[in-house]
Amino acid sequence: MRDRSNRVKGDEPSTVLFDTWLTARAAIALLDSALAGTGLDAEDFAVYSVLRQAGEISPGELARWMSAPATTVSSHVKRLVARGHVRQVPHPEDRRSYRITLTDAGQHAHTTAGRLFLPALATVEAALPRPSSDVQQALQDLRAAIGAAAQRA
């Protein structure tokens, strides 16, 4: 049976969740460094990427994607609107709600940051011991497992 203690010394991983946390922190630090000077941090870049792909999305959909509380997303959206990178548009079916979309300035900021993101991505992918598609599938499986565990908790 594998030792599941939280090791501080040695090369052996401690637990899947702890290693996931460490990996997330390392990825955020790498992206924050790569994106320095663009005005976007790793979280901004991820949100802009989702908005660019979705076109328009409700704050609730963004909250589910981010696995974040609605209040966190609301604060984030307000900051991006104030920056002029995101605009709120009325929801076509629900007048009480709105959708968010990138402005032209937001798309430009995302494109500029993307030019710095791609070399960081290429460096990480080149260092992987297996194909990036396999690693990405494992990460998607892990996220699904964490989501399922959160539902049961």
Give the residues covered by each predicted segment.
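C-terminal regulatory/oligomerization modules of transcriptional regulators
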Residues: M1-K9, R115, R130-A153
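Generic leucine side-chain signal with a strong bias for well-ordered alpha-helical environments
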Residues: L35, L51, L62, L80, ...
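N-terminal helix-turn-helix DNA-binding core of bacterial DNA-binding proteins
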Residues: R25, A29-T72
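Charged, amphipathic alpha-helical coiled-coil/dimerization segments
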Residues: K78-Q137
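Amphipathic, non-transmembrane alpha-helical scaffold segments
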Residues: T20-A24, I28, M66, H110, ...
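N-terminal leader segment of winged-helix/HTH proteins
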Residues: M1-T38, R99-L102
